[in-house]
Amino acid sequence: MSFGRRYILLFITFSIVSISAIAQRNTGMISGKVLSLDGEAIDYATVFLKGTSYSCSTNEKGLYHINAPEGNYTIIFSSVGFEKREMPVTLKSGERSKLNVKLKPSTQLAEVIFVGNQLSKVRNSAFNATAVNTQELVNTTKTLSEALAKAPGMKIRESGGVGSDMAVTMDGFSGKHVKVFIDGVPQEGAGSSFSLNNIPVNFADRIEVYRGVVPVGFGADAIGGVINIVTPRRQRRWFVDASYSYGSFNTHKSYVNFGQTLRNGFKYEINAFQNYSDNNYWVDSPVEDFATGAINRKKPEHVRRFNDTYHNEAVIAKLGFVNKPWADRLLFGFNYSRMYKEIQTGVRQEIVYGQKHRHGYSLMPSLEYGKRNLFTKGLDVSLNANYNRNNTTNVDTASVKYNWRGETDRLNSPGEQSYQLSKAINNNWSAAFTVNYRLGENHVFTINDVFNAFNRSNEDLLTTPPSRDEFSKVTSKNIAGVSYRYMPNTKLNFSVFGKQYHQYVSGPMATSAAQDVYELTSRSIDYFGYGAAGTWFMPLGFQFKASYEKAYRLPTIEEMFGDEDLEVGDMSLRPEASHNVNLNLSYNATFGSNIVYVEAGFIYRDTRDYIQRNILALSGGKSAATYVNYGKVDTKGVSISARYSFSKWLSLGGNFTQMNVRDNMPTAQGSTAPNLSYKERMPNLPYMFADSDVNFYWHGLGRKSNVLTVTYDNQYTHKFCYYTANIGSNNSDYVVPDQFAHNLTVSYGIKNGRYNLSFECRNFTNARLYDNFSLQKAGRAFYGKVRIYFGN
C-alpha cells in the first residue's frame, strides 16, 4: 500500500475516533433494571425519554440502557400488566446514571376495572340486560356462541361440530327472533363464514344481551332480543395477541390480533383467525340397509361421521384516526372470510350424504365514525356503514347415495338431496346513524336510523353458459327510532321510545300447483312500535327493573327466500307482533372478601303471527326446513342468576331458566276448526335449562406474577318434544332427551398473562348430546391451547 493511501486511511480513522469522542462528551447514558413490586425482572418493558425518539426495551433480566444528549428529561417505563411510571432524570455529558424502578401491577387491574365498569353499566341499565365478560375465557378454545351460553335465558343450539348450523334461543324465541350486532352494527347477511360459532372468544371484549325490550340505539326489529358483540376499544400503543389450539377430531384453531396507535392518532389493527376440523366423531344412528331398503330405527349402530370437514378463514383490518378534534374515531375497515363445509346429514340424522358440500366467501368494506360533543357540549354522533358481498356455491352432483357405514348405492338420477351446482350471490348494504344529546345532568335524547338493503341472484352452473334466475330476490328495510331518558337522581332513571318499521320485498312467487310457474311479486309494509323502561336502585343493594315494548319483527331473508339448499322460504310470511314485558329484581353486596350477586327475572310475551321453523317432508324420503306463521303464542318464563366470589381464589355461579311457550290460537290456522294443539307447548323448543361453573385460582404458582386457573362448568337441558306432544302417533320417539354436559379446563398464565397454556376436556362423561332432534353432537373431546400477549 502506498504512503498516500496509508495517510488517507489514518486520517479517516483519526477523524472517526475524534468525532465519536466529541459525541460521547456531549451525551450521557442512563441504565438500570425494571422490576415488579415482588422484585422480579420485567422483560420486554418499554423505556423511553418523553418527547424524543430515544427508547429501548428491557432484556430477559429486566435491564435497559439509553444514550441521549445531555439535558433534563422525563423517562417513562411501561409494560403490559403494570402501571406506567414517569420520573424526571438529568443526563450529563460523559456520565453514566443508574436508575432502578419497580412497577405496580395495576395496568391489568385497570383493564379488569374498565371491563367490569362496562359490564356493570349494562347490568345497571333500565333494560333487562346482562353482559358476559369474555376476557375470563380468552385462554380457552371457546367461540363467541359458547361464551354467550353463559348469559341467563340463553340456549345455543348446534346441529353438530365445528362450523355446524347454529341457532340462538332467548327466552323461548329462537333463530331470527334474536338479532346479532357487532359494535352496534347489524350482522344480517354476513354469511356463514363469519358467524358466532366460528369466531374465537378473543375477538370480543364482552357480549351484551338485551332480552325482549331493545333500546332505540340498535334500530332492531327483534322481539326476542339483541346480542351485541363489543370488540376492544381501549387505546394501546401497540399489542400482539396470538394463539393456537389443537384437539380431538383433528381440530385446529388459530388467532392473531395486532395493532398500533401512534402519537398523532393514526391507528391500525389486524385481526385474523381460522378454524379447521374433520368433525369425524362417533354417533349412534339408524342405518339404511341397501339390500332391503329398510331402516331399523329400534337398533341404531355406532358409526363415524365421514363427510363433515369444515374450515373457515377470516381477516378483519381497520385503519384510521382516533382522538382527533374532528373525530374520536374514524376507521375504515375491510373484512374477508371464506369457508368450506361438507354436509353430512339433512335435517334428520338418518338422512346421510357422502359428497354434498358448499363453499363460499364474503367481502365487506366498512366505515365507522364517532364524535362526542360535536359542535356543542352534549351532542354525540355516530355513523356505521358497510357493504357485504357474500357468495355461496352449493354442490350436490353425486350419482350414488350413502348410508352410515359408508356404503354406496347408485341413484336413478344425480343428486343426494336435489341435483344442483348453483351459486347464490348475495349483496347486503347497511347503515346506522345515531345522535345523542345530553341536556344537563338529567335528560338524554336519542335519534337513530338503521337502513338495510339486500338482493340475491342465483346462477345455475350446470348449464352452459351458466344461467341466472329470471327474478332477483330483493328486500329493504328501515327502522327509525327516537327516545327520551330522564334521570332525576342517581337512584332512578326512566326511558320512553318509539320505533317506525318499514319493509319492501320483491321476488318470485309460485302461481301454479306444481310450483313450476313464477311471477314477480312485491309488497311494502309499515308498522309503529313503542315502549318504556325504568329502574330503581333500592336500599341495601337491591335494584328493581321494569320494561315494556310493543315490538315487531320483520321476516328475514332466509325465512322469505330460503338458503337455496336445505331451507325453503315463503314470501307470504307476515311480520310478528308482540307485547313484551320484563320484571327484574337483583341484589348485589360485598361482605369483606365475599361478593354476592343474585338476580331473578320474569318475562311475558303475547305474540301474534309467530314465525316457527318446521320440517317439511319431500318426495323420496327427503326433508327440508320451512317457516310458517302461528296465529297466537303466549310466553311466560322465569330466570334466576347467582354468583359468589371469595377473595382472589374462588368464583362460582350459574343460571336457571324455565319457559312456558304455548300455542294460544283456539282455531286451526286459516279455518274455524278447533286447533288440536291449543294450549300445548310450542314444538322443538327447549323450555328448561341451566348452567353453572366453579373457578379456582392459585396465584403465585411458580412465581408471583403467575396464576393457575381450574374451571369446571356444566350445561343441563330438560327433554323436549320435536312435534306438538298431543298430535300424531309414536311421539315418544320424537323427543330430544335430558342432557347433562360436564367440562373441565385448566389454564396457567405466566408473567401477568403474557404466556398462557391451557388444557380442556369437554363432555368428559361422554354423554349423548343433542340440541336438535336426532342430530347428535360430539362425545368426549380434548383440546390444548397456547397463547401469548405483548403490548402496552
Description of each model-found segment:
Residues 145-186:
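Extracytoplasmic beta-strand/coil segments of soluble accessory domains associated
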Residues 97-102, 144-147, 164-169, 181, ...:
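N-terminal periplasmic accessory domains that precede
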Residues 597-606, 628-721:
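Gram-negative outer-membrane beta-barrel transporters
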Residues 537, 544-549, 553, 576-636:
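Membrane-embedded beta-barrel scaffold of Gram-negative outer-membrane proteins
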Residues 316-339, 358-515, 519-531, 535-539, ...:
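Face-selective signature of the C-terminal outer-membrane beta-barrel domain
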Residues 65-67, 185-212:
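Short acidic/polar hinge/loop motifs at secondary-structure boundaries
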Residues 236, 245, 262-348:
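Periplasmic-side early beta-strands and strand-to-turn transitions of outer-membrane beta-barrels
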Residues 35-37, 46-50, 78-82, 92, ...:
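Short, acidic, small-residue-rich periplasmic hinge/interaction motif at the N-terminus
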